[in-house]
């Protein structure tokens, strides 16, 4: 299979050195992301696009390649093509006929040709000749350039002919690794996950920072969605997941800060901590999912007071986004269900929160705060490579595993819905239910407590994590299914 990868249009207007740098980075990213599917994949760069060739023929692997490319920053779209040496107009017609002939019978169609290089003919010359001959020889109903039922697309490049089968849109942006790095503050909800996606989509490499206010289930949920975002949109780069224990910080705020200023002070402490971590990682920008006035701490006066504690640039890609638009985007990118099932820990509830906090008053409230508590939280922060975060969580858990399901037991497939649909788990004589891993904590309590449940995933890591959490919650009827 051969693909022509069209780069993000804004790359093409850069200076020659910058353009070359970006296209080389994109080629490197493509090789990295596709390496496990085809170690020998060939990616060659030219001035405004990349040419990708693979000898892989497995339809499932080819589909996965396409899905990964559609989610890779830097790609405007890509074309699946067949390449031939350029012949005369009759030869071009014959090649088009091989691929489109059967589909044109009784249809209204058009021919579109793009051309690059020096030729004695124009693109329109090709379109007129090929279109006229295909109409006569393929039994087409007619030609309509504005509303064709079928569009025959070809490209002529110097002495090569490309017959285009399909076009797949990408997400645009710049290739990861070509621009600077950021640190996104993650809660795992709609806002922070969409903000992380927007930053990745633009081409900024994103590390993840989570402030744990006391919920183990919440930490697990945020790790899962951060790993999902990285795997789908940013896996060409190695980034970190940072978990900061903030329970003691929260306790200090609850005990020493006036109720009306708790939310703003908590955000300032988080920004201080994130700035310290960013400094360690040589990162100059922080990212949050805040939107103007969505909650009391997100009014313009409060955001201004919050930002006073850091010299870092604070990026808020959702600052003027409406909540429903954010939710719709989360559903489109695959994080919506994660957010809906995200365990919450709400330890700061202001009865009458200030919507226009004054900097002087906030600083006065913070005078009683013991900053040693914040320093301890930073000292105990865990920095884990995002590609190992799930494995590391599950490696020391002692959970009973079974290699065979028995009659009466129910196997719960907790893989992502896409994986469960592509490769359904079927066991003779055994009931199999699907329940995505991000919904397990919320939905397991709805199941019949008298039955025995076996959690299943591909590697056994996610199933061990969720089985461990369910057991700690008092559900004794859960095991892990690891078929031999």
Curated annotation (Swiss-Prot):
Role of this protein:
Catalyzes the ATP-dependent transfer of a sulfur to tRNA to produce 4-thiouridine in position 8 of tRNAs, which functions as a near-UV photosensor. Also catalyzes the transfer of sulfur to the sulfur carrier protein ThiS, forming ThiS-thiocarboxylate. This is a step in the synthesis of thiazole, in the thiamine biosynthesis pathway. The sulfur is donated as persulfide by IscS.
What is the name of this protein?
tRNA sulfurtransferase
Q: Name the source organism.
A: Pseudomonas fluorescens (strain Pf0-1)
What's the main place this protein lives? cytoplasm
Q: What cellular component terms from Gene Ontology apply here?
A: cytosol
Q: Where in the cell is it found?
A: Cytoplasm
Q: Which HAMAP family match?
A: ThiI (MF_00021)
Q: Summarize where ATP binds, as residue positions.
A: 185-186, 267, 289, 298
Domain of life, source organism: Bacteria
Annotated THUMP domain ranges read 63-167
């Amino acid at each position: 299979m051969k693909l022509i990868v069209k780069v993000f249009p804004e790359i093409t207007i850069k200076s020659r050195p910058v353009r070359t740098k970006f296209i080389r980075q994109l080629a490197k990213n493509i090789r990295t992301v596709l390496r496990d599917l085809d170690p020998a994949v060939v990616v060659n760069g030219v001035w405004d696009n990349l040419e990708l060739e693979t000898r892989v023929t497995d339809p499932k692997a080819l589909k996965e390649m396409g899905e990964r490319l559609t989610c890779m920053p830097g790609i405007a779209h890509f074309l699946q093509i067949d390449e031939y040496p350029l012949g005369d107009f009759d030869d071009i017609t014959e090649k088009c006929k091989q691929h489109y002939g059967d589909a044109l019978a009784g249809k209204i169609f058009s021919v579109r040709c793009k051309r690059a290089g020096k030729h004695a003919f124009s693109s329109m010359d090709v379109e007129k000749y090929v279109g006229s001959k295909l109409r006569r020889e393929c039994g087409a109903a007619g030609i309509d350039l504005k509303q064709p039922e079928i569009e025959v697309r070809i490209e002529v490049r110097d002495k090569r002919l490309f017959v285009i089968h399909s076009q797949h849109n990408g997400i645009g942006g710049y290739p990861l690794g070509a621009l600077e790095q950021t640190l996104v503050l993650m809660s795992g909800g709609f806002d922070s996950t969409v903000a992380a996606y927007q930053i990745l989509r633009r081409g900024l490499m994103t590390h993840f920072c989570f402030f744990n206010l006391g919920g183990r289930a919440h930490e697990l949920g945020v790790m899962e969605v951060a790993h999902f975002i990285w795997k789908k949109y940013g896996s060409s780069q190695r980034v970190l997941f940072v978990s900061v224990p903030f329970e003691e910080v929260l306790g200090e705020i609850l005990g020493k800060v006036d109720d009306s200023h708790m939310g703003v002070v908590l955000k300032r402490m988080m920004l201080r901590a994130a700035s310290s971590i960013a400094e360690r990682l040589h990162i100059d920008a922080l990212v949050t999912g805040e939107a103007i006035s969505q909650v009391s701490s997100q009014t313009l006066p409060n955001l201004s007071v919050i930002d006073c504690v850091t010299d870092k640039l604070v990026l808020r890609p959702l600052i003027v986004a409406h909540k429903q638009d954010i939710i719709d985007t989360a559903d489109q990118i695959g994080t919506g269900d994660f957010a809906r099932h995200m365990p919450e820990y709400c330890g700061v509830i202001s009865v009458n929160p200030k919507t226009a906090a004054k900097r002087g008053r906030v600083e006065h409230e913070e005078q009683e705060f013991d900053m040693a508590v914040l320093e301890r939280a930073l000292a105990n922060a865990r920095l884990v490579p995002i590609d190992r975060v799930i494995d590391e969580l599950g490696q020391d858990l002692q959970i009973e595993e079974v290699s065979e399901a028995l009659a009466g037991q129910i196997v719960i497939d907790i893989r992502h819905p896409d994986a469960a649909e592509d490769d359904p788990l079927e066991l003779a004589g055994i009931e199999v239910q699907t329940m995505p891993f991000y919904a397990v904590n919320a939905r397991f309590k709805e199941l019949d407590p008298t039955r025995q449940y076996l959690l299943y995933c591909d590697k056994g890591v996610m199933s061990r994590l969720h089985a461990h959490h369910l057991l700690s919650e008092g559900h004794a009827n859960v095991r892990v299914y690891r078929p031999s």
